[in-house]
Amino acid sequence: QYHASHILWLLLFLLSFLLLALDWIYDWRFNRSLVEQGDKWLLLSGHIVNMIWSNWLLNITGLAIVEFFLSSHASFRQWLLVILVAAGVISAGVWWWLPDIKYYVGLSGVLHGLFLYGALRETRFYPLSGYVLTTVLIGKLTWEFFNGALPGSEDMTGGRVLTEAHLLGAVGGIIVWLAECLPYLFDRLFNNKS
């Protein structure tokens, strides 16, 4: 069934494909020195480009999973907000928390935000699968936090997997989800005293 957010996923697919096919990774990646010189747009564009085709394929597969299984749980605007907030949180985190990172590329951090947001939204419609997916994602993030990238993932991506970006992206997804839930929770707590 068609959902307006499919346009968003298609745009991400096409843009990331073209940037890799045209070998524009170096022009669009997060580049700390260029950002310091005023190219602030690189704070967002770095999330669209990928290092190599296998990295792109992994990210697009993740995007397809979000599209086919989770996208109907939120509107185009909500998904776009998750993408922008997750990308912003990742870029801020890389900028302030990881000052030794000079370059960053990849959609995987934003994907973690999309997945966690989608899983939390899924708990409203399909509680069992929503809670299972949320638990699996938190387990994966916990593993990565303490142990680094999953075995074999750096071979598939062609470089270092910045697991901190996965965690930061997930935080971005949670921020959007909480921003949507808090008004409802406050209303229930303070206005529905039945």
Question: What positions do the PLM features span?
Answer:
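C-terminal transmembrane module of polytopic alpha-helical membrane proteins
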Residues: 1-4, 10-14, 48, 144-194
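N-terminal TM1-TM2 helical hairpin plus the immediately adjacent luminal interfacial "cap"
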Residues: 9-85, 91-104, 156-163
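Alpha-helical transmembrane segments of multipass membrane proteins
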Residues: 17, 68, 91-96, 114, ...
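Alpha-helical transmembrane segments that form the membrane-embedded catalytic/substrate-binding core
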Residues: 54-63, 105-116, 158-180
